[in-house]
Amino acid sequence: MKERAYPVYTVNKHAEGLLVGGHPWVYENDILHAPDTEPENGALADVVSPKGAYLGTGFVSLHSKIRVRLISRNANDTFDAAFWRRRVEYAWAYRKTVLEPADLTACRVIFGEADQFPGLTVDRFHDILVTQTLSVGMEKLKPVLFPLLAEVLRADGQNIAGIYERNDEALRAKEGLEQNKGWFDLPGETHPESTQTEICENGVFYHVDFENGQKTGFFLDQKYNRRAVARLAAGHTVLDCFTHTGSFALNAAKGGAARVTAADISADAIAMAQRNAERNGLDNMDFLCEDTFALLPRLEKEGHPYDFIILDPPAFTKARRTVENAMRGYKEINYRAMKLLPRGGYLATASCSHFATEELFIKMLKAAAKDAHRQLRQIEVKQQAPDHPILWGVPETNYLKFFLFQVI
């Protein structure tokens, strides 16, 4: 076997097949032989097949079931600042290719494994980059990588005022990392004082609280699905369940809906949705602070005249063991929406859970339609926006399902 620059992990044939197929993760139970001296947490290591063939180099995670996350499959790569600069430039060039120019000020700049930055998310909100670091390798790389992020985008003429870290995520514990949030100190720079900003997407303005909002502050993955709803909303009476800060509801209202009701169980979310409606000068909207599971049966009983319903719930499951319960939840809200809609009405329904696969989601929709004595006329099937790329061979990158139906 060729001499390696880094400690070597030998994996079994199962892992070899996954890695050759494009997956970047090595699980601890797939390791046949570990280095005699365990590398430091977050250090680099090589991965080889049972016969010693080089499979890749990645970051070691000693506290995780995912022992190695590959960053390269080229044995000749040197992992210096120039290497990471090229990676950032490549990721940004991809966004410039697949997104419309107006969408580049509110987009996902780095999408973890799909961009070969395992465990790293970087979202851009106007002049702020908001990061979430969920692997120890990326955590240790921050002093090199984060200044490069600002440099590369600025070199392209983008205005970047600062980088804010949203590492208040429980998953960091699996990497032996603490939770925290705050400004990253770019060398020689002072960060902005405010942790709030404004973005524009599809011609709709949003207030973004990237310190306290969910995830990094705003969900960018539905940008083109929101546009699909706006195109269809004109003249309709729309109910947007799980509205969060109002994104689908605002697009429907701006698209010419006769009336839009935005509903969410969170009073804070409703307050933000109202603020966004005011910012956009939309007066054809109402707001309800109510649990969708109670709201839909109540509206059906009262006979409310909605002819377009949007269901964009948070993930009902984040693990395989809870998928069955999650699918029952998805079926309940979709069944109730179909019952509430008149024949000929429209349903937009989504799931952001990777574990609720498209196959399971379609099966659930068929069952809900059967129980509701409705048929579904498919208008569009969509997925996450292309700044959240789906990497074949890495099913974890494929998570968002979005269906637009006429209910007949």
PLM region descriptions:
Residues R259-D264:
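Conserved SAM-binding motif I beta-strand of class I
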Residues Y306-R336:
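Mobile active-site "lid"/loop adjacent to the S-adenosyl-L-methionine
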Residues T245-A258:
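Conserved SAM-binding loop of SAM-dependent methyltransferases across substrates and taxa
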Residues E332, Y346-I408:
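C-terminal catalytic and target-recognition region of SAM-dependent MTase-like enzymes
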Residues G235-H244:
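Conserved class I S-adenosyl-L-methionine
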Residues D268-I310:
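S-adenosyl-L-methionine
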